[in-house]
Regions:
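Regulatory hinge/linker segments at domain boundaries
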Residues: 6-30
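Hydrophobic residues on short alpha-helical segments
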Residues: 25-32, 59, 71
Length: 81
């Protein structure tokens, strides 16, 4: 934005790649493999509340509404292979 005129100088917005923690990536991979939260909790020796908190954070960081959208977006960004 030009300070004097208030006009936008560039119309292109560059989106930064979302940053997931190692644990969030691990959980997203397990979700992609079809594991439920309670199964992920057991497998990783976490409480289900911790797993669900990670799931919530993943959705927020990727700005999506559900796990399928999160998986697709993470694959598109190269976060998951």
């Amino acid at each position: 934005i030009n300070r004097k005129t208030g006009l936008i100088l560039a119309s292109t917005v560059i989106l930064a790649e979302p940053q997931l923690t190692k644990r969030e990536k691990e959980i997203l991979i397990l979700i992609r493999q079809g594991f439920l939260s309670k199964e992920i909790a057991y497998k990783l020796n976490l409480s289900i509340y911790t797993v669900n908190n990670h799931r919530k954070n993943i959705l927020a960081k990727l700005n999506v509404d559900n796990a399928i959208e999160a998986i697709n977006k993470a694959e598109n960004f190269g976060i998951l292979y």
